[in-house]
Amino acid sequence: MMTINNNNLNNSNNINNNNNIYTSNNNNNNNNYLIQTVPTMSETFDHMIETPQNDYISIHNHNQHNNHSPHQFYNNQYQHYQYTNDLIKLQPFCEINGQNDFQNSYQDPYQHQLSPPDMVGPYVNSYSNNSNNTNLIQNNNNQQLPSIITSPTIPLPPSPPSPTIINNSNNTISTIQFVNNKKRQHSDTTSSSSIYFIQQPHSTSTPFSLQCPNSPNSTSSSPLNSINYSYHPTFRVVTSSSSSASSSSTSSQPPSPQTLLSSSSISISNSSSFYNNTEASDEEMEEQFKEYLSPTISNLIESSHRENILNLVNDYLYEELPLKSLLMELREIQYQLGNGQNQSLLNNLIELFLILDNSSNVMINFLKENGVEDSEITIDQKRLSIILNDFENGLRGKDKTIKKSTSRGLRNPPNKWTKEESSKLITLVHENGDKQWKKIALQIGGGKTGAQCAQHWKRVLCPAIRKGSWDEEEEAKLFLLVEKHGQSWKNVASEIRTRTDIQCRYQYFKSCMSREVPWTPKEDEILQKKVIENKQDSTKEIGWMDLSKAMARARQTKIPRTALECKIRFYFLNAQL
């Protein structure tokens, strides 16, 4: 008999006879174990044990295949039975699928352990570790019950990988190895049929981390021979230690841009002779970038701004959104998320720009021209030194040939459209229409797909799409359509007809951000002056779009005022006179 028992039976007397129990209705010997998640507090068994969507271990044979999700598999294999005295006295058990074994489901951190059961109620359980022995279970009336044998064919669940196996990175900064629910991680200490399904990373401060205490009864290191097996019910990936990075970022004062640029250890071209006249391959650098950005990306994926960030990056790669607008949007997202312990995506991008550029003065000027402030350019000197060392160590560890180059510079976006390709696309659309995109993509070549051709035509080259600033009528129509359709930008763009969904989304958020900034007396003065100058020419109406551009050139606010906003503000001021 294989019994999953608990070392602490103090709460066994609190179990009511009316509790429910799960038992198997499938007699197939497919060796599937389900490790349920049970609250660690001492409660009665009145609440049904719930199996989470992703937290389970499946141990099965190679000749059988299971495509169900954990929740579907659990519901298909288990059905509810009333807890009766005829089955088990005093203890809640679950019958394991396909075997005459019972699983103790006590509500305890060490609930998933293999240990000999104590004598319970009127039943005296004779237990033996030897799987070849047949044991009889007798009750007080000396009634002989069917014998239950410890099955030699069922392998014990493998011990969970330690945090050093999950996070085997030698970097000192905080890194995360992403293992989604579809990837499988095999344990080297068990048979090849053992499979872990690992959830997304959690903070080490949560009670679900791997840093749980070991069982005091655990004596054997081999998971196949150990009787006591401690397995936490919700196994998750945790982040590696980042004490050195966090301590350096909090203990040192960020220097000024001049101090940052004057340090020889900051520039990637001067930090080591490894970078003086050589460069790593794109694949190696990309791998290091992913490792560096992974903590920030993992936090953004779980935030409510995930879709907005993905759309912004996509627009920038397709050259539909300038870098200045991208940085402005990222700054606004940073304000909405708050100043937490993790760095924002904007800070990470600024650091990467400084690392990749060999002429930092040029990069500083470039960032300032695109709206980056001095306070955002200053970063921690010790942290940047750690980043450079990690990049260098990570690239040195690759057994690949280092390519020589005079300078690296920033990478161009993938599949960037040239003028010749854009002209050819216009010609092919006039010849074939705007439906046969696969055919057009084959004729253009250059690795372009049909979707890329369609997006480039609809968002960039289509003559019906207007470019540049919005006038007051377009913006007023935009707000009405957003009130009608919500943030379904495709529906909004289909009714506007002269703007793409990307333009509609960008203009809407830009207008909302501008309206949150109060008008200053200086702005009101400039607005009144420009309107008076425009009215002197009575042959034409007031051009609010041109007036908003003049307001933007005055640089009284960081966010330019829109044409509709200028019009509303002017009539509001004159109504008060």
Swiss-Prot record:
Residues 403-465, 466-517 form the HTH myb-type domain. GO terms for molecular function: DNA-binding transcription factor activity, RNA polymerase II-specific; RNA polymerase II cis-regulatory region sequence-specific DNA binding. Residues 1-23, 206-225, 240-264 are annotated as: Disordered. Transmembrane segments: none annotated. It is found in: Nucleus. Residues 437-461, 489-513 bind DNA. The keyword Cell inner membrane does not apply. Residues 213-225 have a biased composition (Low complexity). Pfam families: Myb_DNA-bind_6 (PF13921). Keywords: DNA-binding, Nucleus, Repeat, Transcription, Transcription regulation. Its main location: nucleus. One of its GO terms (cellular component) is nucleus. Residues 518-570 form the Myb-like domain. GO terms for biological process: cell motility; regulation of DNA-templated transcription. PANTHER family: SNRNA-ACTIVATING PROTEIN COMPLEX SUBUNIT 4 (PTHR46621:SF1). This is Myb-like protein N.
